[in-house]
A protein has these predicted regions:
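Catalytic glutamate of the conserved HExxH
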Residues: 82, 221, 233, 237, ...
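Non-catalytic, topology-defining segments of multipass membrane proteins
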Residues: 1-229, 274-321
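Active-site-proximal inter-transmembrane loops
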Residues: 168-176, 238-264, 269-271
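C-terminal accessory segments of proteins
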Residues: 224-242
Length: 321
């Protein structure tokens, strides 16, 4: 277990029940899995035949894809992950709400649920109880493949649900964030279809509207989803581990830009409350760059990151293994 993460870090009361499981919760999880994990992937497959037989690819398709991919990706890494889960920095109330909204557009789950699941992941990283470890299904080839599939995708079908009163009491007290959490489904569905509405109104062509839904909605959600899920699966199996963390987290710096800095996963597990994942010069971290921009605008403060001496000491521990 990652000893750096403690109950005190998140003000988690010890007496609460840790997880819940019921037919109602299981039904909600299956519904979400179908709506935001199966359907977007199926609809993404329609993109190629649609452009082969119905309409050519437009520049606006690529633009709406890239724009919403960046907005939702930063919403997850800067908002859901660094701000709400790890409290790695403080932000203006309107910025907090905007980041929660952008994260909800990604279709990765309501912000409070997401934070609760991720806090439990850090508490029990790669140990029994970790919601999405790939390392708990045995070391045979079949067990490893099953673990990777579990961590990447199938864990979301149905799983023990972390008690939000236990793990995220701080977020439940935030009325604005609780409001975004409550309207998650409406926000995520709007993220699928509003791009098509905008593209259709701008061009006044139904083909542009369909392309907007496919590229800005389903394809964007599917691509972003797989990059996030790959952190859970592949980066708890493969890559570099310069820091000793007590789990199986790894780095994959060559895809740090595509993951908005999340690919520095071993760095993150070594310093979970750091707003900066790319800890050294040249280690690309768009999420950190976004925090820096917010800070320069006076919209973020109390930035948490390890100093150079601590980083170097932890790196030396890693080299001495």
């Amino acid at each position: 277990m990652n000893s750096i993460v403690t109950h005190a870090e998140f003000d988690i009361p010890r007496h609460k029940k840790l997880v819940s499981k019921s037919p109602y919760i299981a039904a909600l999880q299956r519904r979400h899995f179908f709506a935001f994990d199966i359907v977007p992937n199926m609809m993404a497959l329609v993109v190629v035949p649609y452009h082969l037989y119905v309409a050519p690819v437009r520049a606006s398709d690529v633009v709406v894809f890239l724009l919403l991919w960046a907005v939702t990706g930063l919403g997850v890494t800067v908002g859901y992950h660094r701000l709400f889960t790890h409290r790695a920095f403080a932000a203006h109330d309107h910025v907090r709400t905007l980041l929660a909204f952008c994260g909800a557009l990604a279709g990765q789950g309501p912000v409070i649920s997401w934070a609760a699941i991720h806090r439990r992941h850090h508490e029990l990283s790669d140990e029994p109880g970790d919601p999405h470890s790939p390392n708990l299904h045995g070391q045979t080839l079949r067990g490893r493949l099953k673990g990777l599939m579990h961590a990447h995708y199938t864990w979301m079908i149905e799983h023990d649900y972390p008690n939000v009163a236990h793990y995220t009491a701080d977020l439940l007290k935030d009325r604005a964030i609780a409001g975004v959490n409550r309207h998650y489904y409406a926000i995520a569905l709007a993220g699928l279809f509003v791009p098509g509405l905008i593209c259709g109104l701008v061009t006044w062509q139904w083909q542009a509207a369909v392309s907007g839904i496919l590229w800005g909605g389903f394809l964007r959600m599917a691509v972003l989803g797989h990059t996030i899920w790959a952190i859970n699966s592949l980066l708890h199996r493969f890559g570099a581990s310069p820091f000793v963390t007590g789990d199986h987290s790894h780095n994959a710096g060559f895809v740090s830009l595509l993951t908005f800095g999340e690919a520095w996963h071993n760095n993150h597990h070594a310093f979970p409350t750091s707003a900066k994942f790319g800890l050294r010069r040249g280690w690309s971290d768009p999420g950190w760059w976004t925090v820096c921009v917010l800070t320069s605008l006076g919209l973020a403060s109390d930035i948490r990151q390890p100093n150079e001496s601590l980083i170097e000491r932890r790196l030396q521990e890693g080299r001495a293994r």
